[in-house]
Amino acid sequence: MNKPNPNKQTVELNRTSLYWGLLLIFVLAVLFSSYIFN
């Protein structure tokens, strides 16, 4: 029986949450800059 590696799963989960965090920061930065410059 070949079980998936839980460590690999954790790394993928961390990478996904990291990408979501970067996307959230990027969106907030765009909204903040448009709020400042208008």
Swiss-Prot record:
GO terms for cellular component: chloroplast thylakoid membrane; photosystem II reaction center. Its main location: plastid. This is Photosystem II reaction center protein L. It is found in: Plastid, Chloroplast thylakoid membrane. It is a single-pass membrane protein. Belongs to the PsbL family. One of the components of the core complex of photosystem II (PSII). PSII is a light-driven water:plastoquinone oxidoreductase that uses light energy to abstract electrons from H(2)O, generating O(2) and a proton gradient subsequently used for ATP formation. It consists of a core antenna complex that captures photons, and an electron transfer chain that converts photonic excitation into a charge separation. This subunit is found at the monomer-monomer interface and is required for correct PSII assembly and/or dimerization. The keyword Chaperone does not apply. The chain crosses the membrane at residues 17-37. InterPro entries: PSII_PsbL (IPR003372), PSII_PsbL_sf (IPR037266). PSII is composed of 1 copy each of membrane proteins PsbA, PsbB, PsbC, PsbD, PsbE, PsbF, PsbH, PsbI, PsbJ, PsbK, PsbL, PsbM, PsbT, PsbX, PsbY, PsbZ, Psb30/Ycf12, at least 3 peripheral proteins of the oxygen-evolving complex and a large number of cofactors. It forms dimeric complexes. Keywords: Chloroplast, Membrane, Photosynthesis, Photosystem II, Plastid, Reaction center, Thylakoid, Transmembrane, Transmembrane helix. Pfam families: PsbL. One of its GO terms (biological process) is photosynthesis.
